[in-house]
Structure formats: structure tokens, C-alpha cells
């Protein structure tokens, strides 16, 4: 009876994880799911775009604290173009080609951009930079640029270093403050009533990542946190089709 119980629980958890993984995200363009929690936005090729959206809207009336790992590639010079974490109410199929990090032109939207290429037309700095930019507008002199640009990594001009970097996005609903951290260090923050000023009073948004390459390119990826609803022993693997032990 004990063995039957273990098998039954294992099968139940596998079903839950399978449904959770396959139904949770929509993948567009060049983007592809690499593993249960890892997504590629662009390959190392020119003029690509990709986006990955969570299918479940979140309510900006509530606070959130999202943690990811991001990979911006190995190519520093040449290398391009970057990625964006985006909040938008439109759909799970939006995204643009070419320059603009796959985010340009999406409106209404809130984007935290990680830009690895200096585009003069957007008044980009020479270093890899992070900013908070609204409504798919990437020009840093625009009123839609509400924080940054500053170095994406504190004290380091280059984020295309072949390393995974921790990206944390915190939204504090009572104070209407959004903050981004890279590798545990606060980089940009802004106070803005997104629901009233940007989203026409509707607090429900999709969240996701976009990315693009242009004439230069990089492999660009992100990882989500694994399913937090169950607690596992250290080293326990939790991907779909991998065995669960107790």
C-alpha cells in the first residue's frame, strides 16, 4: 500500500508539472524552449526576434518579486542587440523584428531593457546598459525613458561575457515603485502609476521577455524560477519527464 501511494503521488505531481510547463508560456518568432525553465530568445544569427510570454495575466494592484537568470551572449564586439522584460495587456503574440529588442512599438507597455549595442538614434551610451522605458519607445531622451540608462552590471561595461546573470524585478504596488537588480545590486528604479498613466485603469497585464538581433548578434536566453509550490531536497531535479523521488 505504501508503494502504491508513492507511485500515485509521483504520477500526480508529474501530471501537474507537465500541465504547468506546457500551458504556462507562449513562444513566438525565433524563441524556443530549451529546457523546462530555460528559453532562448535569439540564436547567434542576424536580424532575428523572439518573445516568450506567460499566459496568465498578473494584477498590478498586487506587489510582485520576480527572479530570473539572463544570458546576453559571448560576443562583445561585435554583439547585439539585447533583451527586455515587458509588462503589457495586449496578447501573448506581440513582438517586433529587427532593432528595438523585440520591444519597440509595443504599446501600452512597461519595459526594463538590457541593451548591449550602441544605437546612435536612440542616444545609447557605449556600455551595455539597463533602463526603464515605456510604450516600446527606446530613445533615452524621450519622456518614455523614466530611469537610466546606466551600466547593466555595476562597475562593468560588458554584459556579453558568456555568463548567466541574476535579474530581479520588484514591483511594490502600494508605493507604485518598480526596481530592477542585476547580480544582487540595484540598478534602476522608478515611481509611476502604471495602471492609471499607461494602462487606462486596467491592472491586468501579461509579463514576458523579448529579444532581437540586427546586423550583429548574440545567443540570448533567460531562465525562470522553477515551480515554487512544492519543496524538494537539495539537488532534486524538477523538469518534466525527470523522475521525482521522495
Regions found by a protein language model. Give the residues of each.
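A detector of low-complexity, intrinsically disordered, Ser/Thr/Gly/Pro/Ala-rich segments
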Residues: 1, 20, 94, 208, ...
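Bacterial Sec-dependent N-terminal signal peptides
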Residues: 1-25, 239
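Generic N-terminal initiation segments characterized by hydrophobic and/or small/turn-forming residues
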Residues: 8-14, 98, 191, 243
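Compositionally biased, low-structure terminal segments
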Residues: 18, 195, 231-233
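Polar, low-complexity loop segments and adjacent catalytic/binding residues used for recognizing
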Residues: 23-229
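Proline- and Ser/Thr-rich low-complexity, intrinsically disordered segments
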Residues: 230-246
